[in-house]
């Protein structure tokens, strides 16, 4: 009977639906994360809106320099009464009627000694500064994204270390349990192994929570709300161009490419142009205007008229307000120049720190990799010694702890190099 059931099961097995394989966890690449952040991050959206507003202010500053054209149309109905009485003692209307008017007027500023053109050029320079400010924010968003991505990738690598540690602890537990059952090892070895496995389980839970948390922070760095059920894998390490160069060459690149440096330089230009514009208030302005109009009391009796005017306007005394505005603008320019020098010094520090951090991290990776290899060999030797009966459970446990620590240090070394290169990118103003 059992044989019949077994044959029936073999016959029916191919017809049974196969269990669907679990879907693979999607992988979010660094390039994709950067693209999402550049498109969706709220800070960048706000910066783009501010740039659009600055561009609109350029148009507003240009408007007074262009011809101004206006039109008007009016209709008036009027009536009046005499001030003297008639023979009947009553006042009677003297006049009443309609009035129609149509007109077009044009005006043009001819010259104002740089008052209007200075405001326009200052607005253009301010727009340039805002564009660089937007780019500088994009550089910082990219750095924060890389930092969050590399942190999540390191957390995933540490999760793999925790999984390997738990797997090794379970293997050791089964081996030790078998030795204890046959009397080759004391009961205390089994208790120690169970404790080590429990600790490994706790470490695995903590590593999983850390990975989940870092993916949530990565979502925030991308500026999106999305599920965290995806994996991140750090791309292969690639050296940055010039990362092994000296500080002087990297500093030249940074000063010519960093958007915060260029933004402050444009702010200085805008302030100087604003000063020139204010000084135009000392001089007169010359404008011209002309108009054409038609007036009528009846719709069939229009009369054409025109006018033209040249206007020279000059504020002879304004209580010293122009002097005060000029002094204020010059002081603001001096303050911006001081900030510019301070920023140049900070750029040098940023470049120096990032360059040294990259060099130190590259050296640490080789040492961390060697330490991990030695720790793995040590664990293999400890396992062999324990199975041969010449080692003890403490030696075995310590070897596993040493391997876990060495693997974690290797992950940390890789993360440190990735983050150092990200800082160097930010220091030289690269996206």
Give residue spans per PLM region.
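Bacterial N-terminal signal peptides
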Residues: 6-15
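Acidic, low-complexity, intrinsically disordered peripheral segments
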Residues: 19-23, 79, 226, 407-431
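Bacterial Sec-pathway N-terminal export signals of envelope proteins
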Residues: 20-74, 109-110, 226, 232-268, ...
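Small/polar-residue-enriched beta-strand and adjacent coil segments characteristic
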Residues: 29, 68-136, 257, 262-343, ...
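Amphipathic alpha-helical coiled-coil segments
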Residues: 46-61, 137, 141-162, 171-174, ...
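Transmembrane beta-barrel architecture of outer-membrane proteins
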Residues: 99-101, 147, 192-195, 305-307, ...
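Short, charged, amphipathic alpha-helical segments
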Residues: 124, 187-195, 393-401
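Periplasmic alpha-helical coiled-coil/stalk elements that build and connect Gram-negative outer-membrane
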Residues: 137-253, 354-357, 361, 410
